[in-house]
Amino acid sequence: MAIRIMGTGSCLAEREVSNDELSKYVDTSDEWISSRTGIKNRRIAVTETTTSMAAEAALKALEMAGRAAEDVELIVLATVTPDYYTPSGACQVQAAIGADKAIAFDVNAACSGFVFALNIAKMYIETGFVKNALVIGSETLSKILDWNDRGTCVLFG
């Protein structure tokens, strides 16, 4: 059975923090960060939520795919930073985009979460249980980071 990705969408938090700005708060420098990670800037979720960014990206993906929210039968959201424990972020996205008939749940598997979510959707499609799935990865790590820990705050946003 041929399975394909029909559309993609993205959403970035509005606030951008440079290495120079970060060096005002922790013992680091642009040179130290970029030489070790290649990172120059990161995005910080101030007003955005995991769900709001996921919903925006989902709508863009549906538009690119030429599909309506009503066509979506499965929503899998990969995140370690849900807005709430319940309802799941996927259920919130489901309501936000109007995919009322979709099965919706979250996958919490850190960096590999999106890969697991994609594989779960693939298995649902291969079994014939659904035809159209929406797989989303969305994080707001900036809300849970220790901004005094140079070992992690330079990596995530």
Q: Which ranges hold each PLM region?
A:
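Conserved "HGTGT" condensation-loop signature of ketosynthase/thiolase-family condensing enzymes
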Residues: 1-73, 97
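Cofactor-binding loop segments of dinucleotide-utilizing enzymes, especially the Rossmann-like FAD-
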Residues: 8-10, 80, 138
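Short beta-strand to alpha-helix junction loop
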Residues: 53, 80-81
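Acyl-thioester C-C bond-transforming condensing/cleaving domain
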Residues: 63-70, 83-157
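Short glycine-rich or small-residue beta-strand-to-loop segments that form or flank ligand, phosphate
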Residues: 74-79
